[in-house]
């Protein structure tokens, strides 16, 4: 076994995040892995998550186990208990074992100190990430949180009642810092059970998957009119989503496939290629989930528009590769943080390939994948007003959820899914409490604990598209949601000098023009909301026309302009007067074509958003900043 020293300082200060990583590339099993009972361990090239080899475990009887007596790295990780020290590895299962699980036991000599189970209801690779502080104390109830104890041994026990089987282990280390956003999944549903931020939303896919609809299918009888609306909306959305062929997207897919080296062995069926990780784990040369989305969309587009059969084969190759690598139903991939941003193209790709997937008897599997990674299960239940980061959900997940719902073939099930999403949407367009994400009573929109127009603009753009799709149906926005959303849009029209807002509310990108103004693609939201009710809302329509003049117009925008002009609606005059946004600690004074933005901060609203690589010197951007903006 080759031991990779992640940090030169591991032996000096013991502060490296990963310590020593087992990678098995030299074909040798370390002497610390021993006491193999009722089975064998070997180094295999069948499957690998790092390099070309992994540790293969074949057990031949119940009660099989092996131990890891690592008196250097296990104590190293436990010393970082308060920093979320723990275990990280990837496990490959060639065969799903529903209802069965591995048992991990950490000991101090002969005394069991920590334990956890790893469910084996999967095939392919799955991440096993858990901090010692989230493990279980033998003999104690679930609500007892572990304390730091000395440990020096790990025992891995085969699943009870399974007489023989095979598993593979790779990318294994005893870590001094398990990501605080380690994602609960089907393998360890409570691997982050003492998370203090109850509002965290990226890591809730598996939790949502346990939700049930309040409407039983047998009791749900959609009307003929509702089904007709559903069919028409499905066609409308599908036409808009598929758009036109993009040769650059197609070429990009082929280029990425070649670079990824993804291949299927014609004899064993095993799939090989560069390893796939989410951005938080991905290193140079690895494949990311966005790469998978890019490849699937390009090949789907080539097949759908050009009838290219080899593109269909490549699509299936990438699809199977993704599943094999752990980009699958029920998987958390270690941490899936911000998954909505890298998962937006897959629904479109899968929908394009529907007929082909059905011909391969893979449609149900693909649809399940789309429904899971879009979080469609969340709106099975009413909106929870205390869930956070709502703008991210609107922006990255809302339309994929609609697509996933409309892909359902059974019309009653499709109706239930769209109805649930509609009710959840109406519930989410509300005044959210405190500083959590969402719209506030003064029309500001919070993200990351403060008013954040850049995120709001993008989220509102998606809500506008959604409103356009459901307009005129029984799934449309209700009066309350429409009124609150209008208030937020009109507030944006007043704190923007045409499209641009003040530097004090630019967050961590104060000097990037694309992050400090309403993007052209989001302007149509004003128009779509204007026509969402029974009559055209002249306030929204006239402000759309005012902002439209400064935008790079699309066909849809031009059509909305013609519609409003035909109704005699003229562009709005610039806002006048003083506008107070107490939730944002902001004031805006408008006069003619100019605007003054005043920004402060307080104990509830931060003065600047500073990341390690963003806005390092932006501390004072809200310290009573006064900015004069001209005509935009």
Model-assigned labels for residue ranges:
Residues 231-519:
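Aromatic-lined, polymer-binding surfaces characteristic
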Residues 146-149, 159-175, 181-184:
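Extracellular carbohydrate recognition
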Residues 59-142, 162-167:
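Extracellular ligand-binding interfaces
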Residues 18-38:
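Extracellular carbohydrate-recognition regions
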Residues 466-632:
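Extended polysaccharide-engagement surfaces of secreted carbohydrate-active enzymes
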Residues 43-66:
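Short carbohydrate-recognition loop motifs
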Residues 4-13:
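Sec-dependent N-terminal signal peptides
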Residues 24, 130, 154, 170-174:
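Extracellular beta-strand elements of beta-rich domains used
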């Amino acid at each position: 076994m080759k031991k990779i020293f992640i940090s030169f300082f591991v032996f000096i200060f013991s502060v490296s995040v990963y310590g020593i990583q087992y990678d098995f590339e030299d074909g040798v099993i370390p002497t610390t892995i021993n006491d193999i009972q009722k089975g064998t361990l070997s180094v295999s090239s069948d499957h690998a998550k790092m390099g070309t080899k992994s540790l293969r475990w074949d057990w031949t009887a119940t009660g099989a186990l092996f131990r890891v007596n690592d008196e250097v790295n296990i104590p190293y990780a436990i010393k970082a208990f308060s920093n979320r020290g723990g275990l990280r590895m990837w496990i490959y299962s060639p065969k799903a074992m529903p209802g069965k699980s591995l048992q991990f036991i950490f000991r101090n000599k002969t005394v069991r100190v920590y334990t956890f189970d790893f469910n084996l209801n999967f095939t392919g690779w799955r991440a096993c990430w858990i901090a010692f502080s989230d493990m279980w104390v033998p003999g104690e109830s679930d609500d007892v949180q572990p304390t730091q104890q000395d440990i020096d041994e790990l025992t891995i026990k085969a699943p009870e009642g399974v007489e023989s089987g095979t598993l593979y282990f790779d990318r294994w280390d005893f870590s001094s810092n398990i990501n605080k956003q380690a994602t609960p999944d089907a393998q360890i549903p409570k691997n982050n059970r003492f998370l203090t931020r109850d509002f965290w939303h990226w890591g809730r896919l598996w939790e949502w998957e346990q939700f049930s609809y309040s409407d039983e299918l047998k009791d749900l009888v959609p009307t003929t009119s509702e089904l007709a609306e559903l069919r028409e909306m499905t066609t409308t959305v599908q036409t808009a989503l598929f758009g036109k062929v993009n040769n650059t997207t197609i070429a990009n897919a082929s280029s990425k496939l070649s670079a990824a080296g993804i291949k299927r062995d014609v004899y064993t069926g095993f799939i090989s290629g560069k390893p796939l990780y989410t951005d938080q784990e991905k290193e140079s040369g690895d494949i990311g989930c966005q790469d998978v989305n890019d490849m699937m969309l390009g090949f789907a587009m080539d097949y759908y528009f050009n009838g290219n059969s080899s593109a269909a084969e490549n699509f299936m190759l990438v699809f199977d590769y993704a599943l094999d690598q752990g980009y699958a139903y029920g998987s958390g991939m270690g941490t899936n943080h911000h998954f909505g941003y890298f998962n937006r193209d897959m629904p479109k790709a899968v929908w394009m390939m529907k007929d082909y997937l059905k011909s391969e008897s893979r449609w149900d599997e693909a649809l399940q994948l789309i429904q899971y990674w879009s979080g469609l299960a969340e709106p099975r239940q009413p909106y929870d007003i205390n869930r956070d980061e709502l703008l991210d959900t609107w922006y990255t997940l809302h339309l994929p959820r609609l697509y996933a719902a409309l892909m359902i073939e059974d019309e009653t099930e499709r109706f239930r899914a769209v109805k649930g999403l509609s009710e959840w949407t109406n519930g989410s367009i509300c005044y959210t409490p405190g500083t959590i994400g969402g719209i506030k009573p003064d029309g500001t929109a919070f993200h990351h604990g403060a008013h954040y127009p850049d995120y709001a603009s993008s989220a509102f753009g998606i809500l506008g598209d959604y409103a356009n799709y459901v307009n005129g149906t029984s799934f449309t926005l209700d009066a309350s949601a429409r009124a609150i959303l209008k208030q937020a849009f009109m507030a944006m029209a007043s704190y923007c000098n045409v499209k641009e807002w003040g530097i004090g509310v630019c967050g961590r990108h104060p000097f990037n023009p694309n992050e400090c103004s309403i993007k052209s693609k989001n302007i149509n939201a004003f128009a779509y909301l204007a026509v969402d009710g029974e009559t055209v809302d002249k306030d929204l329509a006239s402000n759309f026309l005012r902002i439209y003049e400064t935008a790079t117009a699309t066909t849809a925008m031009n059509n909305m302009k013609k519609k409003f002009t035909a109704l005699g609606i003229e562009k709005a005059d610039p806002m006048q007067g003083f506008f107070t946004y107490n939730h944002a600690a902001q004031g805006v004074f408008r006069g003619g074509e100019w605007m003054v933005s005043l920004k402060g901060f307080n104990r509830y609203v931060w003065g600047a958003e500073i990341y390690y690589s963003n806005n390092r010197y932006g501390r004072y951007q809200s310290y009573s900043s006064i900015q004069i903006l001209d005509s935009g």
